[in-house]
Amino acid sequence: MEKDKSLITFLEMLDTAMAQRMLADLSDHERRSPQLYNAINKLLDRHKFQIGKLQPDVHILGGLAGALEEYKEKVGDNGLTDDDIYTLQ
C-alpha cells in the first residue's frame, strides 16, 4: 500500500511560502522586527539549521584578503591613488 504524500507536500509548500515571505519582509524596514527575527530563528531551528556550523570558504576569504592588500599598496592613507589626487587638484 502506497502512502499518501499530499499532506507532506502541502506542509513543504506552506513552509516554503512562509520562508519566502519572511525573506521579503527582511527587505521592508517597517516589517523588520524582533518578532520577525524570532520567527526566522524558529523556522531555522525546525529545520535543524545552525549558523555556527557554517564554515567560511577559505578560498573566497583568501582572495578578499589578497585584494585588500593590493588595494592598500595602490592607495595612500587617504584612500586615493596619485591619479585621483592629481585630478582633484
From Swiss-Prot:
Residues 1-48 are annotated as: Helix-turn-helix (HTH). It comes from the Viruses. The keyword DNA-binding applies. The keyword Transmembrane does not apply. Disulfide bonds: none annotated. Transmembrane segments: none annotated. Keywords: DNA-binding, Viral genome packaging, Viral release from host cell. One of its GO terms (molecular function) is DNA binding. Belongs to the terminase small subunit family. Homooctamer. Interacts with the terminase large subunit gp19; the active complex is probably heterooligomeric. Plays a role in packaging a single copy of genome into the prohead. The terminase is composed of two subunits (a large and a small) and the small subunit recognizes a specific sequence in the viral DNA. Once the DNA is packaged, the terminase detaches from the connector and the tail replaces it to finish maturation of the virion. Packaging initiates by TerS recognizing the packaging sequence in the viral DNA. The nuclease activity of TerL cuts the viral DNA and the terminase-DNA complex binds to the portal of a procapsid shell. The N-terminus contains a helix-turn-helix (HTH) doamin that is involved in viral DNA binding. This is Terminase, small subunit gp18. It comes from Escherichia phage T7.
